């Protein structure tokens, strides 16, 4: 997934994943598999063609054991946004070619408004959230994940409105709600209820919400 993203799965691990896919189907909870090829021994423009073949071979392995949704992660990584958008485009095309695979999900470098200057992703333009997401305007079916205005941000109408009307050209966010995860403070557990302080009632202008346990 991350540090070993170039390595294909052995048969025993594929069987474990097949069982997880089946457990998801049985519980009406879709299993999605993610790859992060931008951090450890990252894909580059010079290795792109060979690395794309490796990624697709791995996707084929997972498809053959029942995985029907895939996630491409670029969070907390360096590199230029054009390379990330290029890989999104090619993997989106692979997903579409299968006919029964759900839309590709993408976790961007700018996964929250606060992340806009955490890496030098720009291609010469000003580093703004809107300029970042312009690189994905030609990929309307790729689902863009978003944690809000900051890493651990509540699901609020304001951030969905910002994403749709200011940060993108009418796209709806697929929110990655960083709750009740506690990796920003290992000294305590998040034990409170998920009330309106975490998830506002009556939300609109969003594609979906997943929580991070």
Annotate the PLM regions.
Residues 1-51, 55-58, 64-68, 96:
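Feature activates predominantly on carbohydrate-active enzymes
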């Amino acid at each position: 997934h991350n540090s070993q993203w170039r390595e294909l799965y052995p048969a025993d691990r594929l069987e474990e994943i097949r069982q997880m896919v089946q457990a998801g189907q049985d519980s009406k909870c879709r299993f999605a598999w993610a790859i992060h090829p931008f951090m450890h021994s990252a894909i580059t423009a010079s290795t792109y063609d060979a690395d794309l073949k490796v990624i697709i071979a791995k996707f084929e392995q997972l498809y053959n054991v029942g995985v029907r949704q895939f996630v491409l992660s670029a969070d907390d990584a360096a590199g230029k946004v054009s390379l990330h958008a290029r890989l999104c485009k090619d993997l989106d095309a692979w997903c579409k070619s299968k006919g029964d695979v759900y839309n590709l999900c993408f976790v961007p470098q700018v996964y929250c408004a606060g992340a806009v200057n955490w890496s030098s992703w720009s291609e010469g333009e000003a580093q703004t959230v809107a300029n970042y997401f312009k690189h994905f305007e030609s990929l309307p079916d790729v689902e863009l994940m978003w944690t809000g205005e900051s890493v651990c941000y509540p699901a609020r109408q304001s951030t969905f409105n910002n994403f749709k009307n200011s940060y993108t050209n009418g796209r709806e966010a697929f929110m990655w709600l960083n709750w009740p995860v506690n990796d920003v403070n290992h000294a305590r557990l998040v034990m409170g209820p998920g009330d309106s302080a975490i998830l506002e009632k009556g939300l609109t202008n969003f594609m979906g919400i997943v929580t991070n346990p």
